[in-house]
Design a protein with these regions (language model features):
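Contiguous, small/hydrophobic- and glycine-enriched helical/loop subdomains that border
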Residues: 110-150
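Long, positively charged amphipathic alpha-helical accessory segments at protein N-termini or as interdomain linkers
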Residues: 133, 160, 168-262, 308-357
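Short, positively charged and aromatic/hydrophobic N-terminal segments
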Residues: 4, 11-13, 22
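Short, surface-exposed recognition loops or helix-turn segments adjacent to catalytic cores
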Residues: 142-155, 238-245
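Short beta-strand elements
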Residues: 163-164, 177, 280-300
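Active-site cofactor/substrate anionic-group-binding motifs, chiefly glycine-
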Residues: 81-103
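Active-site loop/lid in soluble adenylation, ligation, and acyl-transfer enzymes
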Residues: 24-78, 164, 209-279, 283, ...
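Residues forming anionic-ligand binding surfaces in small-molecule and nucleic-acid pockets
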Residues: 98-117, 195-213
Length: 357
């Protein structure tokens, strides 16, 4: 039988908070039985395992670090986001996650945060989480603010980018915390569009990011301990059997089909950048004036079922403004975060004068 739904035997260890008062809540910290560094995909699978198998009303949290890796969003096309040749030449691994959002570089000087909650409202959960992390940073006298779609900023520069997705009965939020990083690798591996950089008011990736080490005297390990002590009030340690179950889940993340994603044929491409939504690219296959396939790429965030809500109703319909408008739901923002029906219609069909949907 699959380990996917394995029932865990867990050891509860109450975290020591003798040096710090717990500031922000009573999350459970989830630890591994050993401290070895694992593949990035393992930690993504660990999030799923925790969500599906740890039976607690409390939220769960853990931190992790990886060897140089690139991780891109569920709806992104790898060749649009990553310098694949540089990654291969420098042994930088590439992974796809199940959440939306953009592409990030991670290494051992960059801390990754994972947060798992029973909350069903992913948008509300997301906002609450990034504000909690920003508040924790401010407790260290770091002028951090939760801004934009998914970022935590210091003086207008990003120190943390986050993404989220939903599985039955749980929401998962994960993100970066830039303590330090190999700037050469970050700049060389990521290939954001000129439009994305301009929208941030910068000319390069380096201009857009902040590093925690420039704002605090704590070492990386000291910062991790401070975070754990102040966000969590208890701790569990997974078992060896749990590790086997996580590795079973991880297999999906390692398949070429999952990493490369689907890239169906297309005859028409429309691109837009929408404030509060992200960069979007619609690829449609139109034959005889009829929509045969639709693929919406980008760093947007899904909060609903895009296939059932948006794509399936379009397939087989004539490619014209009226049929697109009639096929789309009235509240597309319930599927793609912050994207209204007018904007989605424009993405699919192109900008029209006096467009009414």
């Amino acid at each position: 039988p699959s380990f996917y739904f394995a029932v865990s035997t867990l050891f509860y260890i109450f975290a020591s908070n003798t040096n710090h008062d717990n500031l922000f809540g009573k999350m459970i910290y989830v630890s591994l039985p050993t401290t070895q560094t694992r593949r990035l995909s393992f930690y993504l699978a660990m999030e799923e395992f925790v969500a599906r198998n740890i039976n607690t009303a409390d939220d769960c949290f853990f931190m992790w670090q990886v060897e140089p890796s690139v991780i891109f969003g569920r709806n992104q096309l790898i060749e649009n986001e990553v310098n694949i040749d540089y990654c291969r030449q420098n042994n930088i691994k590439t992974y796809r996650r199940k959440s939306g959002g953009g592409c990030v570089y991670a290494d051992m000087n960059n801390i990754m945060f994972s947060y798992i909650t029973q909350s069903e409202n992913v948008s509300l959960t997301f906002d609450r989480y990034i504000n909690m992390v920003a508040e924790m940073l401010r407790s260290l006298h770091i002028p951090a603010e939760a801004t934009g779609r998914n970022d935590i900023m210091i003086h207008g520069r990003k120190v943390s980018g986050n993404a989220f997705y939903h599985i039955p009965h749980h929401s998962i939020v994960h993100g970066t915390m830039l303590y330090d990083t190999n700037m050469q690798n970050m700049v060389a591996t990521l290939t954001p569009s000129d439009e994305k950089l301009v929208s941030k008011g910068v000319k390069s990736i380096r201009q857009h990011i902040a590093l925690l080490k420039d704002y605090i005297s704590l070492s990386l390990e000291e910062f991790k301990q401070y975070t754990k002590d102040n966000l969590c009030s208890s701790e569990i340690t997974l078992t060896d059997a749990d590790i086997l179950a996580i590795e079973e889940i991880e297999r999906e993340y390692l398949t070429q089909e999952f990493i490369m994603g689907s890239n169906p044929r297309y005859t028409k491409v429309n691109k837009m950048r929408i404030e509060g939504v992200g960069e979007l690219e619609a690829r449609l296959e139109i034959k005889g004036g009829v929509i045969k396939s639709v693929n919406i790429l980008g760093d947007y965030f899904l909060v609903g079922d895009i296939n059932a809500d948006i794509i399936a109703p379009l397939i087989g319909k004539p490619y014209d403004l009226q049929h697109i408008s009639l096929s789309l739901p009235d509240h597309t923002e319930l599927t793609i975060r912050n994207l209204n029906k007018y904007q989605l219609t424009e993405l699919l069909y192109g900008k029209q004068e006096n467009l009414s949907v």
